[in-house]
Amino acid sequence: MAKKVAIILTNEFEDIELTSPKEAIEEAGHETVVIGDQANSEVVGKHGTKVAVDVSIADAKPEDFDGLLIPGGFSPDHLRGDAEGRYGTFAKYFTKNDVPAFAICHGPQILIDTDDLNGRTLTAVLNVRKDLANAGAQVVDESVVVDKNIVTSRTPDDLDDFNREIVNQLND
């Protein structure tokens, strides 16, 4: 059965960390929905990729989705700057309810705002790892880490492994 995956995103995302997993999800027969600050707007990646925002964070309901993708780049840091903390609250639904959450590179920064990392094993790009550890996570240096429903990965070099695990989780 096809599943629906939310992608939370804003400007300065790492292009390939969005396009590659999104393509893998869609090629596996699942749907993706881009969520951002404003529906029917456009966000631009660090390398110029333009992506339409389908649904605003104000209108998005996490329970409508079967998974969450958080690409890296500077987007996660910008999303964490949301004054109302809506992106962390959105992500918390997934971590607390055992719904798959996929985060790569700087993406796990959003997971810090879920207050649900204590005792979880994660990976991320090097300069995010200390923040994850300070949030209570056990941090390892592996291409992909699966801890229950949370799947994390380090960098674009790990995309093949990350994409494979995303599809495995969605097809379970």
UniProtKB/Swiss-Prot annotation:
Gene3D superfamilies: 3.40.50.880. Pfam families: DJ-1_PfpI (PF01965). PROSITE patterns: PEPTIDASE_C56_PFPI. Residues 3-171 form the PfpI endopeptidase domain. InterPro entries: C56_PfpI-like (IPR006286), Class_I_gatase-like (IPR029062), DJ-1/PfpI (IPR002818). SUPFAM superfamilies: Class I glutamine amidotransferase-like. It comes from the Bacteria. CDD domains: GATase1_PfpI_like. PANTHER family: DJ-1 PROTEIN (PTHR42733), DJ-1_THIJ_PFPI FAMILY PROTEIN (PTHR42733:SF2). Belongs to the peptidase C56 family. NCBIfam families: PfpI. This is Uncharacterized protein SSP0918. It comes from Staphylococcus saprophyticus subsp. saprophyticus (strain ATCC 15305 / DSM 20229 / NCIMB 8711 / NCTC 7292 / S-41). The lineage of its organism: Bacteria, Bacillati, Bacillota, Bacilli, Bacillales.
